Amino acid sequence: LALNGLSGNLQNQHNFCYSPFAVMQIRINGQLLLLMLAEKLTQIGCRIVQANTDGLFVLLKKSIYEQANKICREWEQLTRLTLEEERFEAMYQYAINDYIAVKEGYKETKNPDLIKTKGMFITKVLLGKGLSAKIIPEAIIKYFVDGIPVEDTIKGCTDIRKFLMSEKTGKQWHVEYMNQEQQRTNRFYASTNGGYLWKWKYTGHAEGEVVEYYEPYVRRQSYIVKEKSYQNMLTASGVTLLNKFDDKPIEERKINYRYYLREALKIIEELQPRQLELF
């Protein structure tokens, strides 16, 4: 943590540690050293799945593990850096910082602590982060890792908190729900009997005002503007606000399960052809 903090301060021009050249030295040298390790590993038949700023994700056969380990130890002696090793049974990667990694031992123990998630697949609520529906990554993880159908996970969940989303709007926006103005920070879930949640701001023009503008090589253009500019905060479904928790049974909440299923399946369909099995 201390090293990460220093690295950030080296590129902060308002910090006394500011040193752009040192940042480039650290990052370029680090990348070149990792590239050297990656090159050595590919020469013995390893496949580099991911190369990040601080490590490599490598796919290899058990028969060449000792050879790969020897290369890593030689690299440590040469660079005076230390490598840490984690073994995985499977990895499902959507983007560079969005993945599910199943650590060695999960298949036998089913210990949830052996599932490592990052980015969009994190199922825990993080302070300071916007709230997204945690049932979606949970359903995706159970589908890939345990073979449980997405519909079973989503429709079998009885915790309304896992369906909740939230959005905070800036001071220039007003929030409107069912023709009533709301607070700027709202918590809601997709429902079949709710209305749309809108945010709007003043455009600076009068209702029906004609605005003219010019484009190069095009004749003068004009359009009619409105006093307010509206944006739908969840276009794919109506919502129900839940800024205050209550004891209503989940069966009575009219959850739009199709919305959550669609969002989960959308990710699965993109991810499935690129999944990596490491057994």
Regions found by a protein language model. Name each.
Residues 54-60:
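A generic structural motif
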Residues 45-47, 79-80:
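Glycine-centered loop/turn motif at secondary-structure junctions
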Residues 40-41, 50:
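Helix-rich, typically C-terminal accessory recognition domains appended to large enzymatic cores
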Residues 1-36, 42-44, 59:
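Helical catalytic core of nucleic-acid polymerases
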Residues 47-52, 85:
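Short beta-strand
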Residues 4, 31-38, 57, 68-76, ...:
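Short, well-ordered alpha-helical packing segments
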Residues 65-279:
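C-terminal, non-catalytic extensions of nucleic-acid polymerases
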